[in-house]
A protein has these predicted regions:
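A "functional boundary" signal
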Residues: 1-170
């Protein structure tokens, strides 16, 4: 496996950053650069994995859960990057929560918990401001998704405890 050229890495990263920046502002403006990053990533598999996470988010927001699931699952074959894998885990948690697939929800939740522990143990790896933003967002989203799940199960104390774990400085 070769190393991606710097030009490709910078281009794909810029597309992914644009997709991420628009995710809650304009879904179309998020989708288009994510699709472009996915299609143009040749050797930069981590960038393609990030594009998958952005595309999975868009599909989820459009309530196309089958497509979102397929896209998120593709991440596992593209990278070993714990952040991208964590984001895919959380995306799948959200899908399985919405579709009532409790076993699958817990499988990916347990995977996310293990990844979060590894990320915390090796937090010096994430020095880039954008990466830190994504780490903080992923952790926050994990606790929100967990809280909603507990709330649906009428486990209010657990739901509140999960919300209390959201880092305030994130």
């Amino acid at each position: 496996v070769g190393t991606a050229p710097t030009k490709e890495v910078r281009f794909i990263d810029s597309l992914n950053r644009r997709a991420y920046a628009y995710r809650y502002k304009n879904l179309d403006s998020s989708y288009l650069p994510a699709e472009q990053a996915y299609g143009q990533a040749r050797l930069y598999q981590q960038g393609k994995a990030e594009a998958c996470n952005n595309l999975g988010f868009c599909a989820f927001m459009q309530m196309d859960f089958e497509r979102a699931e397929k896209i998120y699952k593709e991440v596992y074959g593209l990278t070993k990057n714990e952040l991208e894998l964590l984001i895919a885990d959380i995306g799948l948690m959200k899908i399985y929560q919405r579709t009532g697939m409790n076993k699958e929800y817990y499988d990916y939740r347990n995977s996310a918990v293990r990844r979060m522990k590894r990320i915390r143990e090796d937090s010096t790896v994430f020095t880039d401001k954008y990466e830190m933003l994504r780490v903080n967002f992923a952790f926050t989203e994990f606790f929100i998704v967990s809280s909603v799940y507990y709330y649906y199960l009428q486990q209010r104390p657990e739901a509140m405890a999960s919300l209390d774990k959201i880092p305030l400085d994130a």
